[in-house]
């Protein structure tokens, strides 16, 4: 509708539906067109005009393109609520798809794809097949996108009617925009499918690189994103691909630049020549710098992506730190991101410039920005040992300014510097103590108390300083109370004189008798028992040498960083979270006929395993939690548990609660004898491509239990709950079963890989219950773990022999190959091939755990005889024991 059509939105008439109905059936074309515009205007502002469906559909029979577009718009909006009437429009769609005007042909097929009604999809197939082979490229490119929409509605239909093959044929089209749309459609379908659909080989690669130079900017983005998923066969091929893509770095469109950077970064992993890598780093710097002269919103997205890039390849922007200096008119969100990148790029060569900038920022008016700047100085000190003294000098200068929040932030970071460089800069403690009276923030108080306790033997009046804090002990936040407790114990152990003895009695009494905080009370009891039984042991525990803290400027886990770099220029790279952490994507598996499912060249002809087939509509199990109960749904539980174990889980979100079958018995993780009558059984499970924590809570106590909350500690796989624990109030003798959706790679722990999952559960009537569960890989194996035979062999050969781990299971008996493969397929371990070795059967399978870690599996057994030998090859052999645990659990279940 054009600008002068705004009059259609300004009507205030009542009872206009009958009038519109009359105008829609007018014999005059102009009157009908005006009536349709009024209907669209009413629909746009939220009025219900669905009663005019038949009358509007009758207006489709027109040669007027504008009117046809308006009617199609109405159809898209109301077809779902009027599916039976929408069928009336099918004949016109079919007729329009054969119209001489290519615009009308494309419009018809585009609209049919947008109408998400199952009854219409069957009728869409024939016109769509014709449009995919249309003479006009505009029609073909529109039809390509329509295939992706149809796949979302009915994946099986798309497979059966050969649309995927037709889409792949369009990659060879002579029109670059058709190629780009075909690539976009195939990429979309691949993201929502468990089976390999869009795999780029050398032939397709050549066609895409050719089309790249000729298609529009958004077409280039689609092609570059597809190319970034291609794994070159050798360094030479990777160099050739990068050479063809490098000119895109000069493009005016920011999306094209970022997609080109993503693609180049992925291929650089395979390039071995240091000269080539150095030249590529030089070429990528100017376009990334140019992004910072765009609008603030684009700058922010660019900065979030650059943050990831400099963690992987800091040399790209090592000499460009000045472009990240904050301007006076930068929005706060841009300034904050620039600070982060400056910390990452800080080096011994440029630290003086950086410190001057940070010092200037620390005198600005925005409190949050000032705090971040002061903290940045501390992080630079921790990162650069040779610059630490200069950083401390700047912090001391800032403390002398006597601005309260600057002083407090400086004390917080100086505490970290003391941890990083013990027994080096303690001479400044006297200066810090001068600001003692101004501290009013919990973190600053806790930091100052830690410093006093840690260096009590060097501070003459340490007992007086701590006593000044103890006056308000009951009113202090938990963070300060905990630190005061520990600092007082340290003081007593270092100076066991009369003053500290009296202080320790007061503190322990307050912390055990006067408090409701279980953490504080438990720690106080531990100290009390240590001091009363063995003071020397207490010294060994409390005054033990602490590990030196390290630089946190590259804080992302390397595997998570690689995943985020593969998603540059998407929301994932802005959130710094993997897609599955904030998007629940439904994976669709196309059911094939029995003949199609056999592995080519397989000796057994055993079908490859696939995920559970689901309909095109979203399955509730993919997106929601489950609760089986009799009572009505409770209100969402607030996050009172908070940061129970130091983890940083996402905000709690209420979870829907459809019912679920009770399922098989779950292992008990908290027996009633330890839980004051509360018994919890739980286990990680997988359903429809989603990991759940399945729980059964039983109230064997004599009182009502309600207000249940849960928290997961940091763990090796980053498992965290998506929502709050939705459990109804449990009467005595009652029980409830729930399935909590989980995400991965969000709550990562450091150190060696462990299968331990530490959980805390709380309710309104009882203390916090801590228990340990086991992370079983069976629940983590993803649906996209199937490998082609050639890929399996290539990956097996590429991994060193040291990555192969073997284990024998003498107690496991294979009764039949087929039942074994069925069992493994149900846990997403996919059959590749089989061979005979004498009287032994050797099976080859593949599986994949989160972050794309593959497992290449070889099982050897004699059917009917005890004994199973399992060999696994993986890039991360340290988690092989967890894999063997999963295999044993699977066969013994």
Curated annotation (Swiss-Prot):
The keyword Protein transport applies. It holds the Pfam family Adaptin_N. It is a peripheral membrane protein. It is found in: Golgi apparatus; Golgi apparatus, trans-Golgi network; Cytoplasmic vesicle, Clathrin-coated vesicle membrane. One of its GO terms (molecular function) is clathrin binding. The keyword Methyltransferase does not apply. InterPro entries: AP_beta, AP_complex_bsu_1_2_4, ARM-like, ARM-type_fold, B-adaptin_app_sub_C, Clathrin/coatomer_adapt-like_N, Clathrin_a/b/g-adaptin_app_Ig, Clathrin_app_Ig-like_sf. Residues 593-621 are annotated as: Disordered. Keywords: Cytoplasmic vesicle, Golgi apparatus, Membrane, Protein transport, Transport. It comes from the Eukaryota. Adaptor protein complexes are heterotetramers composed of two large adaptins (beta-type subunit and alpha-type or delta-type or epsilon-type or gamma-type subunit), a medium adaptin (mu-type subunit) and a small adaptin (sigma-type subunit). Subunit of clathrin-associated adaptor protein complex that plays a role in protein sorting in the late-Golgi/trans-Golgi network (TGN) and/or endosomes. The AP complexes mediate both the recruitment of clathrin to membranes and the recognition of sorting signals within the cytosolic tails of transmembrane cargo molecules. PANTHER family: ADAPTOR COMPLEX SUBUNIT BETA FAMILY MEMBER. This is Beta-adaptin-like protein C. The lineage of its organism: Eukaryota, Viridiplantae, Streptophyta, Embryophyta, Tracheophyta. The gene is BETAC-AD.
């Amino acid at each position: 509708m054009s600008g002068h059509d705004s009059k259609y939105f300004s009507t205030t008439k009542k009872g206009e539906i009958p009038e519109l109905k009359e105008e829609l059936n007018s014999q005059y074309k102009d009157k009908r067109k005006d009536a349709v515009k009024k209907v669209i205007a009413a629909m746009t502002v939220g009025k219900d005009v669905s009663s005019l469906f038949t009358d509007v559909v009758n207006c489709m029979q027109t040669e007027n393109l504008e009117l046809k577009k308006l009617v199609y718009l109405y159809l898209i909006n109301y077809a779902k609520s009027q599916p039976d009437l929408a069928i009336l429009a099918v004949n016109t769609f079919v007729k329009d798809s054969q119209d001489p005007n290519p615009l009308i042909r494309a419009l018809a097929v585009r609209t049919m794809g947008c109408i998400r009604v199952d009854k219409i999809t069957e009728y869409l197939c024939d016109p769509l097949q014709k449009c995919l082979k249309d003479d006009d490229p505009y029609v073909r490119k529109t039809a390509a996108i329509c295939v992706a929409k149809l796949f979302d509605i009915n994946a099986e239909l798309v497979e059966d009617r050969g649309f995927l093959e037709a889409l792949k044929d369009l990659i060879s089209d002579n029109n670059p925009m058709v190629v780009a749309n075909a690539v976009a459609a195939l990429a979309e379908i691949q993201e929502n499918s468990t089976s390999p659909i869009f795999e780029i080989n050398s032939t397709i690669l050549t066609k895409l690189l050719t089309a790249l130079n000729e298609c529009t900017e958004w077409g280039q983005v689609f092609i570059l994103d597809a190319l970034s998923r291609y794994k070159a066969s050798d360094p030479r091929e990777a160099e050739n691909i990068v050479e063809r893509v490098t000119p895109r770095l000069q493009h005016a469109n920011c999306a094209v630049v970022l997609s080109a950077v993503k693609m180049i970064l992925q291929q650089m992993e395979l390039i071995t020549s240091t000269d080539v890598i150095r030249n590529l780093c030089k070429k990528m710097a100017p376009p990334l710098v140019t992004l910072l002269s765009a609008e603030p919103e684009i700058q922010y997205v660019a900065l979030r992506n650059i943050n990831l890039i400099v963690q992987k390849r800091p040399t790209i922007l090592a000499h460009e730190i000045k472009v990240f200096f904050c301007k006076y008119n930068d929005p706060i969100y841009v300034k904050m991101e620039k600070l982060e990148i400056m910390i990452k790029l800080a080096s011994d060569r440029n630290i003086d410039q950086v410190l001057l900038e940070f010092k200037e920022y620390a005198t600005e008016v925005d409190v949050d920005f000032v705090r971040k700047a002061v903290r940045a100085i501390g992080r630079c000190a921790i990162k650069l040992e040779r610059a630490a003294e200069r950083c401390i000098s700047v912090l001391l200068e800032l403390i002398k300014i006597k601005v309260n929040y600057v002083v407090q932030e400086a004390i917080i970071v100086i505490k970290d510097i003391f941890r990083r460089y013990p027994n080096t800069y303690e001479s400044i403690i006297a200066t810090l103590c001068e600001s003692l009276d101004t501290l009013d923030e919990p973190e600053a108080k806790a930091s100052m108390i830690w410093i006093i306790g840690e260096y009590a033997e060097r501070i003459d009046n340490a007992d007086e300083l701590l006593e000044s804090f103890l006056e308000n002990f009951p009113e202090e936040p938990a963070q300060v109370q905990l630190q005061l407790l520990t600092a007082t114990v340290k003081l007593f152990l270092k100076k066991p004189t009369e003053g500290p003895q009296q202080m320790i009695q007061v503190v322990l009494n307050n912390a055990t008798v006067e408090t409701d905080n279980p953490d504080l009370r438990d720690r106080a009891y531990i100290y009390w028992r240590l001091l009363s039984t063995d003071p020397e042991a207490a010294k060994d525990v409390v005054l033990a040498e602490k590990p030196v803290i390290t630089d946190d400027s590259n804080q992302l886990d390397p595997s998570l960083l690689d995943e985020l770099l593969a998603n540059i220029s998407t929301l994932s790279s802005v959130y710094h979270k993997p897609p599955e952490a904030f998007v629940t994507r439904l994976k669709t598996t196309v059911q094939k006929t029995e003949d199609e499912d056999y592995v080519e060249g397989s000796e057994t002809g055993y079908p490859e395993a696939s995920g559970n087939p689901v309909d095109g509509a979203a399955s509730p199990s993919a997106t929601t939690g489950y609760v089986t109960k009799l009572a009505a749904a409770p209100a969402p539980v607030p996050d009172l548990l908070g940061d129970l174990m130091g983890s940083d889980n996402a905000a709690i979100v209420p979870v829907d609660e459809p019912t679920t079958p009770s399922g098989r018995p779950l292992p008990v993780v908290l027996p009633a004898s330890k839980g004051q009558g509360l018994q919890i059984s739980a286990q990680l499970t997988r359903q429809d491509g989603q990991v759940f924590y399945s729980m059964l809570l039983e109230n064997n106590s004599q009182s009502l239990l309600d207000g249940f909350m849960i928290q997961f500690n940091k763990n090796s796989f980053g498992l965290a709950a998506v929502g709050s624990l939705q459990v109804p109030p449990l009467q005595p003798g009652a029980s409830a079963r729930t399935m909590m959706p989980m995400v991965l790679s969000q709550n990562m722990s450091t150190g060696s890989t462990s299968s331990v999952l530490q959980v805390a559960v709380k309710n309104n009537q009882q203390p916090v219950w801590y228990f340990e569960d086991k992370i079983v890989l069976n629940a983590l194996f993803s649906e996209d773990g199937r490998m082609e035979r050639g890929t399996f062999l290539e990956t097996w050969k590429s991994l060193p022999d040291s990555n192969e781990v073997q284990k024998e299971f003498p107690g496991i008996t294979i009764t039949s190959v087929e039942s074994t493969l069925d069992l493994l397929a149900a846990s997403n371990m996919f059959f590749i091939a089989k061979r005979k070795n004498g009287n032994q059967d050797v099976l080859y399978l593949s599986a994949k755990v989160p972050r794309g870690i593959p497992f290449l599996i070889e099982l050897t057994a004699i059917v009917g005889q005890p004994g199973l030998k399992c060999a696994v090859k993986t890039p991360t052999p340290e988690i092989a024991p967890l894999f063997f645990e999963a295999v044993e659990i699977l066969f013994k279940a």
